From Swiss-Prot:
Keywords: DNA-directed RNA polymerase, Magnesium, Metal-binding, Nucleotidyltransferase, Transcription, Transferase, Zinc. Binds 1 Mg(2+) ion per subunit. CDD domains: RNAP_beta'_C, RNAP_beta'_N. One of its GO terms (molecular function) is zinc ion binding. It comes from Chlamydia trachomatis serovar L2b (strain UCH-1/proctitis). Zn(2+) 2 binds at residues 814, 889, 896, 899. One of its GO terms (biological process) is DNA-templated transcription. DNA-dependent RNA polymerase catalyzes the transcription of DNA into RNA using the four ribonucleoside triphosphates as substrates. This is DNA-directed RNA polymerase subunit beta'.
Amino acid sequence: MFREGSRDDAALVKEGLFDKLEIGIASDVTIRDKWSCGEIKKPETINYRTFKPEKGGLFCEKIFGPTKDWECYCGKYKKIKHKGIVCDRCGVEVTLSKVRRERMAHIELAVPIVHIWFFKTTPSRIGNVLGMTASDLERVIYYEEYVVIDPGNTDLVKKQLLNDAKYREVVEKWGKDAFVAKMGGEAVYDLLKSEDLESLLGELKDRLRKTKSQQARMKLAKRLKIVEGFVSSSNRPEWMVLKNIPVVPPDLRPLVPLDGGRFATSDLNDLYRRVINRNNRLKAILRLKTPEVIVRNEKRMLQEAVDALFDNGRHGHPVMGAGNRPLKSLSEMLKGKNGRFRQNLLGKRVDYSGRSVIIVGPELKFNQCGLPKEMALELFEPFIIKRLKDQGSVYTIRSAKKMIQRGAPEVWDVLEEIIKGHPVLLNRAPTLHRLGIQAFEPVLIEGKAIRVHPLVCAAFNADFDGDQMAVHVPLSIEAQLEAKVLMMAPDNIFLPSSGKPVATPSKDMTLGIYYLMADPTYFPEEHGGKTKAFKDEVEVLRALNAGGFILKDEICGSRRDETGRGIHIHEKIKVRIDGQIIETTPGRVFFNTIVPKELGFQNYSMPSKRISELILQCYKKVGLEATVRFLDDLKELGFVQSTKAAISMGLKDVKIPEIKKEILKDAYDKVAIVKKQYEDGIITDGERHSKTISIWTEVSDLLSNALYSEIKKQTNSKHNPLFLMVDSGARGNKSQLKQLGALRGLMAKPNGAIIESPITSNFREGLTVLEYSISSHGARKGLADTALKTADSGYLTRRLVDVAQDVIITERDCGTLNHIEVSTIRQGSEELLPLKDRVYGRTVSENIYQPGDKSNVLAYAGDVLTSAQAEAIDDAGIESVKIRSTLTCESRRGVCAKCYGLNLANGHLIGLGEAVGIIAAQSIGEPGTQLTMRTFHLGGVAATSSTPEIVAECDGILVYLDLRVVVDQEGNNLVLNKMGALHLVQDEGRSLSEYKKLLSTKSIESLATFPVELGAKILVNDGAAVTAGQRIAEVELHNIPIICDKPGFVHYEDLVEGVSTEKVANKNTGLVELIVKQHRGELHPQIAIYADANMKELVGTYAIPSGAIISVEEGQRIAPGMLLARLPRGAIKTKDITGGLPRVAELVEARKPEDAADIAKIDGVVDFKGIQKNKRILVVRDEITGMEEEHLISLTKHLIVQRGDSVIKGQQLTDGLVVPHEILAICGVRELQKYLVNEVQEVYRLQGVDINDKHIEIIVRQMLQKVRITDPGDTTLLFGEDVDKKEFYEENRRTEEDGGKPAQAVPVLLGITKASLGTESFISAASFQDTTRVLTDAACSSKTDYLLGFKENVIMGHMIPGGTGFDTHKRIKQYLEKEQEDLVFDFDSEFESVAG
C-alpha cells in the first residue's frame, strides 16, 4: 500500500535521506511491474529431501534471489567474481542472500478480489464511494446476490440487488443481454470503475447544502470526506479491488528446519498456500467450463482465503492452524503490543547491554556506580580489543578474544584505562519517568552484583530485595557526551514533575541525621553542673573527640571521663558562631561542619521534610556542584551516626495509652445510643451505620494522638526509638504507629465499604482470630488492587505520552497577550496550595504591584517569577495573578519557553527542543503507578476524612454570605441553600451590611472562609464576634435534610402509597417508615405547606426526591426549621486512589460521568414548572432580560437548589459530577481548562502527590486542539468535521484573502485516545491504536507524513526532532565551512582512536 518512486528513491530510503513519507493505494500495475520480481504459480515451499526452495514456489530463488551469498541454485556460479550474472541454467542472479529480505513477488488472481480493509473497516470506504450499505456489499462480495451494473433499457436500477430467483425472473423477462448484473469482486470492480467521482462530489456538496437534518448532514459530510480524499489524491477507487496480490519477501516469513525433520514456519506461508491452491483450482475449473454453482463457490473461497491473508478473523471464523490456534495474518503482524510497530520499531533490543541484581554501594560517590569486572569485560570488549591491537599486544581480533577469555593481566589494565571517563547508563524497569535511566561513571568491583548509590534509589524506585537493573554502554562520542552532560546522576537531583529534590537521604541516613540534630535532652543544670560555653565550633569538636561521643546517658550512667572534658551529643551547650552566642547541642555543631557556610548555622531538628528543604535551598544558593558534595556528606554522616546511635526498637517501646479502656467504654456507650435511636425509628439503618463509623473514627484519632504524645515523652534523657523513626520520617507513619500501640481501627471490605465494628486490639496486645480474619480482608484487597491497577496506570501513561509526544519547546517567546488567572487553592478555611507555589517559575502577563502602592512593582510583565518574587506576591496578600500558560500559547507548533516557564528539573528557563509533552505525561502517569502500588501499605485500614463541626481558628466577626437561613425552635440558624459560606473577618468596627458589601466585591479578605452544607446548624448569629477555638457550626454528615422555612400545616401532594411512596417496616425496630420510591408515573412527590388547617392559602412547596424518608405526617402543624424529610447520604466509602485513577482517566478521556449533574445555562433565579414525562421541569429565569432556560431533571436526582435561589451560569443544580463537554458549551474554554486542571489536581492532592499545574495544562491543551465546523462558508472544510485550530485559521485566512466567506466553528473537547488517533502523523496514530483503520484512512486520501513528531522519526530510524536532535541544534552544522568540517572529522577520528 506504500507508494514508491524510482530505484533512486529506494537508495535514498536506505540511506535514510528522506523527510516525508506518503502512503497510497497500490494499483495492479504497481504491484505487478514495480514491486514484483516474478509470479508465484505453485504453493510448494522447499524440497523435503534437499531442503532447497522449489522453483516457482513461495521460496523460489529465481524470483527472490539466492539463499547463499554469491551462489546460484544449481551451483554453476560461485564466488563474488560472478556478481550480477544471471545463471543460464537455473535463472538465479548471483548476488547477496540478503536481497531475499527485499524482493517481492505476486500472485495473479483468477478473479478480482475485494481488499477486506476497504470493505470491512468502519466506515466502509467502498460502501461510502458506491453509496451502498456494508451488508448489501457483503452479499455481493461473497456471491450471495447479484448487483445491477448496467440496467440497460429494463426497469431495473443501477446497484439494485437481485437474489437468484429474482435474477432468473429478470433474465426470463428481459433476456440475458438486456442488462448487466454480476456478483463478487468483479461486480464491485466494475461499479467502482464506472463511478464518476467529480460529479458525485458535486452532488454530495449540493445535498449537504440543502439538507437541514443534523444527522443526515453528519452522514453526508462523512461520505463527502472519503470521496474528496479520492478526488484530491491520485488514487482510483477500483484499486481497492485486487487483481494481483503482492507476496512478502521470503526472509520475512521464514521456514526453519528443526531437529527431527520438522519445520517451524511463519503463519503467512500457510495463508499464502491456501490462496495459491484455491487460485490454481479456480483457474483449472474456469478452463473446464464447470457449472456456475461450483465456480461461484470456488470464487467465494478464494475471496475468503485472501481475506484471511490480510486480516484473519475479520470476516467469519478465523482460519486455524496446528493446535487450533488462529493464524497470524498481515494485519496481526502490525497490530498490538507484539506487532511490527510496537515490538520492532518503537522498542528494540540493544547490544552492549547487561543486567544484574543490585546491591547498595554506600562507599560510592554520587556520580558513580559499581560495575562487576566480568560484566565490564564483556560490555567493553570492542574497546579493549582496539586498545590491545593499538598497543601491539595482539595482532588479530581472534587472538585478542582469546586473551580476554584467559583474563590476562594486561586486559585488566586496559579495562581500567578504558572505563575512565566512559559513562554507562543504568536503567530499572519499569521506567516510569525520565529519572528511570541515568548515567554513572563505572567503578570496577569484585562480585556479580551492580552497586548503586543509596541516594539515587528514590529516582529509580529501587530497593535491594532482589531488584535488577540493566546497564547500557553509549558507544559513539556524541552518545558519551550526551550521557556526561545531560544524564549524569548529579544532573538529576530534582523531580521534573514538581521541582522537589528526589535525591534526599532516607531510612538510616534520615534517622542518623535526625538523631544528631535532635533537641537537647541532657541539661547539665539538672545534673548539678552548668551549661558549657565554647568560643567556636572547633573547640566543640575537640571536646567531642577528647571524650568520645557519649551517645546514651543511661549506658554511661553518671560516670564522665576523668578529665571532665567528655560531652554528651545532646547536651545543651553555648557556642559563639559568627559573633553571636547560640544555645545548641554538640550534635548540631558537628552536623553544621558539612553544611555550606552560605546556608548559615542550622539550629533545629532535621526530619526528612526539612532535609529536603535544605537541599533545595542549598541548590538555589550555592549551585549544583556544592549541592552534590553536600548530598554525599549527608549520606556519609547519616549512615555513620545511625550506626553509632544503634537505635533499635523493643517491644516495650510500644506504649499503650492508659486512657484506652476509658475511651473504648465511652465509644461503646455512644454506639449503643445510636443503635437505640435506630430501634426507635428516629434514624435509618444507613444513618446508624454512618454515625457508628463517625464515632469509631473519632476514637481512632483520639487514641492515635494519645499514643503519639505518650511515646514523645523522653525517659532518662532518652528518646523513644519508635518516636525517632516516625518523627524523622525514616520509617513508618502515625497510622502504623496507631495500629501498633492503640487500636487497628476500622477496616474496609474488598468493595470499599467500611466494616462498622472496628478492631479494638493493637499489634502489641495481639489480635483475636476473628480480628485477624477481618484484617486479612482489607490486606488482600490492597494486594489485589496493586496487581490490577498497575496495568491500568501503565496504560494511562501510554495514552498520555501518545497524546503529548509532539509538544516540544519550539521558540523562546510566542508574544501572546492571553493569560490564565490562578489563585490560592483552599478547602473550606484550610489552605491546600498557597499562591506562591502555583506562580513560581511562571511568566507574568501583566505588572504586579504592591496592593495600594502602584510605585512598588513586585514583578514586571514578561518576568519569570523567582521563588523570592513568588513569596513577595504571596506575602503582599494578592488574591490572584495573571500568568501565561501552555493553554494560551500561540506557537504554531509545540509551545514557547515563556508560556511554559521554568524547567523544574534544574530551575532554569526551559530550553529549546525540550520534550515537555513527554515530561508532562510521565509526571502525571508515574505517581499513578506509585499510588496504585502503595495502596496496600494501609493494610485496608479505613481512611475516611470528615469533620462534623466547624471551629473558629482566630478572633473576628462572623459574616454570613449568600446564605439562606431559618431559625428553629431552639434558636439555632439552619442553612437552607448549598452555595453560601461563613466568613471570619477582622473586627474593624464596621456595620454588618458594610462587611457583606466589601466581601461580595472582594474588597477585603476574610481571615477564614467556611463553605457550609445544606442543613448545617450555625451556632453563632450573623455579625456576632467569635473567639479562637469557639464552635461556629455543626455539619450534618449523614443526611441531606429538607427543612421547612415557614410555619403552617402539612399536606402531601402526589405522595401516593404504592405508587410514589411505600411504607417499609424496619426489620429491627418494627417501626413503619414512609419512603419516596422511584416511579414511572406523572406524579411529582412534594410536601405543600398551607397557612391554615383548611388548606386554602398555600405558603410553600418542597419537592421530595426518591429515596427520602418523610419525617412529618399529613395535617401536622409545623414550625420553621422543622425537618420535613431526609435523604440518607449512603454508606461512606473509603477514599483511595482506586477511585482516583479511574477518575483521572475519566477526566482526560473526557467521558461523561455516571449520574452526571445538571448545570445552569444562564444566570438567574430558580423556579419549578411541574412535571413532564417523569421529569421535573426546572426553569432558570434571568430577572433583567426575562430570558428562560428549561432543564428536564429526572425525579431520581437530588436537587441542590430550591425555588427562589439565585444561580450563576455553570453552577450545579443537582448532585453529581459535571460533564466537561457541558462546561465547554456553557462557560467556554477557559472555565473548562480551569475545571479539568483542578479536578485532576484534586485526585493527586488527596494522595499527597505534588504535580505542577503546567504538566496537566499541556495534556488539557492537547485535548482542546480541535474545533468542530458548524458552517463551512466558502472554505473546503466540511460540516461537522473536526479540524486542527491551526488548519482552521489558515483555511479561513486563505478564504478571506480570496474574498470568500470564512467558516464558523466551535471548540471541541476530545479524550486523549481520540486526540492521539487524530494526530497529523498517520505513522504515529497507527502505532498507537486502531492500526488497520488508521492506515486504511491514510491510504485512501494519500496522506503525507512530514515526520515532525517523535514517534514517527523513531519508527523511520531518524534522529528525534527534540533535545540535541532539535532543528536549531542540527542547523549549526550548516554554518561550518568545508575545511572546518574536515577538521571536526579529523578530531573525531583522533578522539575515537584515543577512546578506543
